[in-house]
């Protein structure tokens, strides 16, 4: 099996290399693609050095079986036909195709079978905040249908890419050395010692595109009529996102019911002993595959409401790992060989 990574030099592209090696993904060959800026860079995978090729409209994907793409929506839109025309399955990490009716949007723990119906040869990887939330909420939805969700996200700098992480570190350095921040390029404001209540562009209804994604993607993945109201916030941590989630179910659920369902849910680790200061934190979830969940409690304002706190590594489960799990499912069921 031949695998391609498009956007190999980025934060998610590099995570693809680590995860494919860690999980011993069944592949015989690897090819890396990137922009003019990245072409020529070399990376080691399983002891062998690979050079990044310039992504072009040619026959480079002729023998590729699976292509993981994480180079932005514009690149995905431009090169989708080039990538898939010889039969490669394109698993795309951008937002470009997520709401297209003929492109499945997949979280393997929830709707893996949707990946088998892909008329364009494309499978969309959901937004990181959506993935983390639905992995936790789907087992609860099986207990009683979730009608409404309110969520506030606390999203680290790495959600905006490797350059954004570097900018945050540079801002802290400038504050120590001069007392002022000079470098503000990847964020609309200084992020160091700050939080920014905007991720992505504002829409006409004053929700950001990130927040609208959570509404639409949750419905598509869970095959649900659930309504989600989100506030997405950038915080000055480097890696791992967190979310405070309130949800209303059709019937009241006890904390014990929820906790027991989550303990056996795939991709979830319950960390919930708040009386002893035990709860999920981004420092602890960074570098791990599971979504950590805790602070599970009844909502004081709604008898059918509960609330919880979750955190997870958005570069792993929120991006690269989820895509690799999709590919593993396709191989497992014999859809890709």
Model-identified regions with their sequence ranges:
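Charged docking surfaces used in two-component/phosphorelay signaling
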Residues: 67, 157-337
């Amino acid at each position: 099996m031949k695998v391609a990574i498009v956007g190999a030099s980025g934060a998610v592209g590099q995570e693809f290399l680590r995860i494919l090696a860690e999980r011993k993904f069944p592949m015989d060959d690897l090819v890396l693609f990137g922009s003019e800026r990245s072409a020529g860079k070399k990376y080691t995978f399983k002891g062998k050095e690979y050079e990044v090729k310039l992504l072009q409209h040619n026959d480079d994907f002729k023998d590729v079986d699976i292509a993981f793409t994480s180079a932005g929506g514009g690149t995905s839109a431009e090169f989708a036909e080039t990538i898939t025309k010889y039969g490669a399955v394109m698993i795309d990490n951008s937002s470009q195709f997520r709401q297209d009716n003929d492109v499945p949007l997949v979280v393997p723990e929830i709707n893996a079978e949707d990946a088998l119906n892909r008329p364009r040869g494309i499978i969309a990887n959901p937004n990181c905040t959506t993935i983390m939330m639905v992995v936790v909420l789907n087992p609860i939805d099986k207990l009683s249908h979730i009608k409404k969700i309110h969520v506030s996200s606390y999203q680290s700098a790495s959600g905006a890419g490797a350059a954004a992480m570097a900018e945050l570190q540079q801002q802290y350095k400038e504050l120590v050395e001069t007392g002022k921040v000079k470098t503000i390029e990847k964020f609309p404001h200084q992020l160091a010692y700050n939080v920014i209540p905007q991720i992505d562009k504002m829409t006409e209804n004053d929700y950001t595109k990130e927040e609208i994604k959570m509404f639409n993607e949750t419905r598509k993945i869970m095959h649900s009529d659930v309504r989600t109201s989100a506030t997405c916030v950038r915080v000055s941590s480097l890696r791992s996102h967190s979310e405070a989630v309130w949800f209303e179910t059709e019937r009241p659920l006890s904390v014990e019911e929820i906790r027991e369902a989550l303990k056996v849910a795939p991709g979830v680790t319950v960390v919930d002993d708040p009386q002893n200061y035990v709860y999920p934190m981004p420092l602890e979830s960074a570098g791990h595959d599971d979504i950590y969940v805790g602070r599970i409690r009844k909502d004081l304002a709604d008898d059918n409401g509960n609330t919880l706190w979750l955190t997870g590594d958005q570069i792993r489960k929120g991006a690269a790992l989820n895509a690799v799990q999709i590919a593993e499912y396709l191989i497992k069921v014999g859809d890709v060989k």
